[in-house]
Every structure is written in structure tokens, then in C-alpha cells.
Amino acid sequence: MTILNHTLGFPRVGLKRELKKAQESYWAGNSTQEELLNVGRELRARHWQQQQQAGVDLVPVGDFAWYDHVLTTSLLLGNVPERHQNADGSIDLDTLFRIGRGRAPTGTPAAAAEMTKWFNTNYHYMVPEFQQGQQFKLGWTQLLDEVDEALALGHKIKPVLLGPVTYLWLGKVKGEQFDRLSLLKDILPVYQQVLGELAKRGIEWVQIDEPALVLELPPEWLDAYQPAYQALQGQVKLLLTTYFDSIGHNLDTIRALPVQGLHVDVVAGQDDIAKLNAKLPQEWLLSLGVINGRNVWRADLSHWFERLQPLVNSRPLWLGSSCSLLHSPIDLSEETRLDAEVKSWFAFALQKCAELALLTQALNAPSEAKLAELAAYSAPIRARRASSRVHNPQVEQRLAAITAQDIERQQPYEARAAAQRKRFNLPAWPTTTIGSFPQTTEIRGLRLDFKQGRLDGKNYRTGISEHIKQAIAEQERLGLDVLVHGEAERNDMVEYFGEHLDGFVFTQNGWVQSYGSRCVKPPVIIGDISRPEAITVEWAKYAQSLTDKPVKGMLTGPVTILCWSFPREDVSRETIAKQIALALRDEVEDLEKAGIGIIQIDEPALREGLPLRRADWQAYLQWAVDAFKLNAAVAQNDTQIHTHMCYCEFNDIMDSIAALDADVITIETSRSDMELLESFEDFAYPNEIGPGVYDIHSPNVPSVEWIEALLRKAAQRIPAERLWVNPDCGLKTRGWPETRQALANMVLAAQRLREEQV
């Protein structure tokens, strides 16, 4: 039996982020819809061709999305929120963008769909909205149109469709509550219609994605798979596709389904391939995701050959990427600044396609020459294990020497709080901001000129110092109590620290999609992490010299740096997080020596890092909390440690939030009307809290009365003496005019509440 290979999906944005640029040009009114559609057609044709040329047997179609693939599925099913609907009920590209970006058909603002993380990745999807009695119909033929495009170009294809149970699982009920699973019977006819249309086009296999099968689903959701797939069988062959974790716990349900094949992620999952092979129906095709779609490391193809060879001829077999290559940059050959050794360790999406082809060829026709080719390809990643670029004995010794004492502050919170009150003598309702101030064109230009060599270090530092001086002066004029330096020197909260730590490298074009038109370029952690010199001390010390008020030192926490980077695969995530924590622990110590008495360690990704299955949560939370404490615990009693977190669900991890033992936590609460504080109230959270009093993602300026009312609500849940007053998040993306006005109103609201206490 000949083994075939395939990818589960390919990056959409284009090597030069062509899709992003075309989207934003269209949204700004600078280009026509036809011009945007042409860019999409060109990208799809190029990506299909590139995959085919790299040796992919079956290229995916339907993985392209104008904004997000879950949103595309919503439109396919005719699921458009009423506030975004065209008057005649039609669906077009503008409908899709309105849902993603927040507009009514009239052009007036209307709430965008909620956005949240796609499983445990850094990609975000638009959450489907469901209402009782809702009707579904085939409303958007993008998938069928793209299948026609690919067939016309002569490609061997495999359409990709998000499965019905996972689609419902990912959504939320709006309005009157009901069981959204009850809508399954209503969406299945649309799926049947789509599969019928694909059958008419001569399609043999359809990849139907059901990643919810890696989760610990409630019994009623697991039971829904059987009737769903009974309804979908018979028109085409279905490759039930899972990824991001193992499926062993749901295997009994899976193997009873009327499908013809199963794709399993054997990179992220711990499934035993031999046992899986033995337990599946003999006639099923087994697709093994052996090439990591979520990281940038070259595969050890010799290793995979040894693991897979016993399966050859045991059943129909395909090899694939572990998940969609959406999460990987496109082409390593474009990276001209990486040194040769490091570059030899990497593989981006196109190189991963070539890896699949090489491994498939070797398994189909093994020979000494082919095995030598696999060994030669795998040699750099094997040589890496002994590279001095990877291993730093001092870091490894320091990590091994960590004791329980290293992760605990000297005294409990009550004693520290007394020492801090004495040192800072802050008023009731102390006001502060989260860290960053508006990144003006001038600031971005200054950094770019320095990075590209048009500006020397001395003039760059002079320019940044001037912006810090302005930020301090603005805050003093506004009457804020605890100041920040404004972060003019920072392009990104993770990249900035990665650039100053050993163990990281950066790409030129390693862009991956975050959501819509937003792309990120994660750093790559290649080895043991250490801090060669102080990172933030110079700027914090300068800012503090300009004012008698306390200035916060600003650090990104170890878990967030880990989660927002491409990590090593040869050590555990815990090891990486603790290495970062040790490096930043030294930064905390140096900030203290420089006279900085308040230090903020941001951990917005703490909750994002949770494993997919709740059974694995406790182990993760233990080391994540320990990493934060290792970072912070070196601080003296009268040094106040702040942390900032911006997400909307604390209930299920409150024990861990409290265990961080930060003196002050600032959180995002304005959009929930302070309801998030309920978790802290119920838990009787003992330390100080700064609930965000206005939404920095909106240009709207909150009134004094609005902020005052929110603070009064907060004081009903948390004792006023433990409350801080601050925005929801950093102000990097805002302009100065609305920033000044919003902060002035915030300070005035705090002053009014203080006056009541006198």
C-alpha cells in the first residue's frame, strides 16, 4: 500500500503579509473589493503550487480564510448575528468583516463577535453566537468556490471542513439560555448539502476537523458524535481529524464512528502509535501527524522512520503535519540574517512540506541511499543536542540549586504591606497606569532608525530619554500617584526581553497570524536562558531621577515570555520558565539596588498556558506559580511587587492567583462592569487589587461619573483600603489626546472618593 502525505492547512497571510496589507487597504477605503479578492486568489494559487512542488500529495482546500476559519464556517452555515445582517439576508465579504471588526450594515458601530484563543495556541477565533430556534442554511459558498479554483488548476486536493460538534462546542449562547447542542440536528442538513456538492465535484476524501475530541467532553457532547456522523456518512470518505493532544481517553467513541479514516497528532499527543493501530477498524485509513505544525524545529526524520516502519503495509497510511501549518512561519529560505548553524535547526511551513515528502518517499521505497538522505537531513538537529549554543552549564547548575526558600518572600503579605505603606505613604485609592504610553510615529521612527543603523546609540538614548521625560511630566501634571516610564524603548513586551537575554533568536519574516489582519513574529528559544547584563535598569533609574513619586519597574513575566515564543522541544516548559525566572530575578535585584521600590511583573498569559485537559492543570499551575515567585521572591519586604493580568475568567484558578502572592494585582474589569471582582470577593482575596476602570481598546473617554460609579461597585466587593485605580491595560495603542482626558477623569474620580473619606 502506497503511503500518501498531506498538510492539514497552510499559512494564509503570504510571505510578505500580502493578505494583511490587502485587508487593511480595503478596510481603509484605499482599494476595491475586487482587488482584495484578487490578492486572495493569487495567494491560494501560490500556496497550492508551493505545497505541490515541495512534494505534498494532497493539498488542503478550505484552510484559507479572509479573517478566521471558524468565522468562515459560521457564514457557510448562514449563522450571522442579527446586528450584522444585510437587510435582504444576503451574505458577502463585508458581512464577514463586520462580524470580525464590529460594524452594522449602516456603518454604525455594532459589537464585534467575541474573540478567544483557538485551543491552546496563540491564534484567536471569532466565537459563533447561537440563539434558540435559529435557522441555518448554506449561506456562503467560499469552500465550494475554492475547490473549483483548485480543481481548475489541476491540483490533487482534500477539502477541509470544521466538524459540526466542534463548531457548536466553540460557540456561545446569546440571549435566553438553552443547550446549544440541540442545534446539531439543524446544522447537519447544511453539512450534508456541502458534502453532496463536494461529491458531485469528484472529491474522494474530506478532512473534517473535530479537535474537540482531544478534550474531556461532557458525556452528552461525546454521545452527539455518533448520530452526527451517521447523518454525514455515505457521500464522500471522511478523515476525522484531531490535533493538539492525544485521543486515547475518547478512543472508544471515535472507533465506533462511521468514518473512513482518522488523523492523530502524534507530536503533541502521547498516544501509542502501535496500540492505536491495533485498536482502530482494520479498513480505516490512519493519518499520523508527525511533522510539528506549531513550532519551527527541523524534524528528526530518521527517528520517525524507525517509529513508523513497523506500520507500513499494516493498513492504509498517510503522513501529515500534526495540525495546520497556520501556526508556523512560511519559508526559512527568506531568513538571511540567521547564522548557518542556527538556521540548520529550523524548518518553516514549506520546509515541513519537504520533510513530509522525504519521509514518505523513504517509507514507500526504503533503500540505503534514502536512509542516508534521512540521516543527513536529521544530522543538524541531532548535532544541536551537544551545541554550546544550547547548553550553558552555569544556568543548568543554578536551576538545579533552587530551594523552597528561593520562591518565598521574606515575610507574609501583612508584614510586607505595613513596610510598603511606611515607605511610600500613598493616599487612599492610589492611581497608576499599567505601563505603556502611546507609541507615537516619532517613537517608532526613532527605534527603527536605531535598529537599521541610521542612528547611533548615543543619539538613540538621548531621544528615548526625552520621551521618558515627557511621560513623567505628563503623569505629574495629571496627578497620578505611582508613575511609569512609558516603555518608549520597547517594540513588544516579549520581543524586547528576548532581545536582551541569551538563548533567544529572532527572525526577519517569521510572521504568524494571530487574528484577522494581526500577525506576530514570536522569538525562538534555542538554548539555556541567561541575562548577560541589566535590561530595564538604565531607563527606570533615569525616570525615577525625574520625580519624587515612585516609578514602577516594568518586566514581562516568565510564563508569558514562554507562551508567546517558539519554545525548545528538548527540555520541559517548566525548565524554560524557571530559566527565564532566574534571569529576571537578577533584574528585580538590580532594579532594587537602583532605588526602584515598585516592580510590576506582567503575566497576561498565565491562564492561556493551561493544558487542554483539566486533569493536567494542577501540575502546570504549580510550576507556573513557582516560576513567578522565583522571579519575584528576591524582593525586599518594602519593595512592592505588582502583576497585571488581562483576561475574563478567574474562578477556576483563584487558588493559583492568590498563590502568586503579588502585593498588588491589576486586572481587566471595565467591560464586565466589575463583575469579575466576584471571584476575588468569594475567594476573600487577601492582597491589593487594581480593577481596570476603563477599556483601553476603545477610543471612548470615560466620564468622571462613570469611573466613580465603577469604583463604588468595586468597593462593595473589595475593602476600599485595598483598591487601586488604573486603566484596564497598557496605553500603547491609544493617542495622547484621549489618554490625557481619560487619565484626568480617572484621577478626579479617585480624588472625589478620597474626599468622602476625610
UniProtKB/Swiss-Prot annotation:
Instruction: Spell out the Gene3D superfamilies in the cross-references.
Output: 3.20.20.210
Name one molecular function that GO assigns to this entry.
5-methyltetrahydropteroyltriglutamate-homocysteine S-methyltransferase activity
Identify the keywords attached in UniProt to this record, alphabetized. Answer: Amino-acid biosynthesis, Metal-binding, Methionine biosynthesis, Methyltransferase, Repeat, Transferase, Zinc
What is this enzyme's catalytic activity, as reactions?
5-methyltetrahydropteroyltri-L-glutamate + L-homocysteine = tetrahydropteroyltri-L-glutamate + L-methionine
Q: PANTHER family annotated for this entry?
A: 5-METHYLTETRAHYDROPTEROYLTRIGLUTAMATE--HOMOCYSTEINE METHYLTRANSFERASE
Family the UniProt entry places it in: Belongs to the vitamin-B12 independent methionine synthase family.
Its protein name is 5-methyltetrahydropteroyltriglutamate--homocysteine methyltransferase
User: What are the leading ranks of the lineage?
Assistant: Bacteria, Pseudomonadati, Pseudomonadota, Gammaproteobacteria, Enterobacterales
Gene (name only):
metE
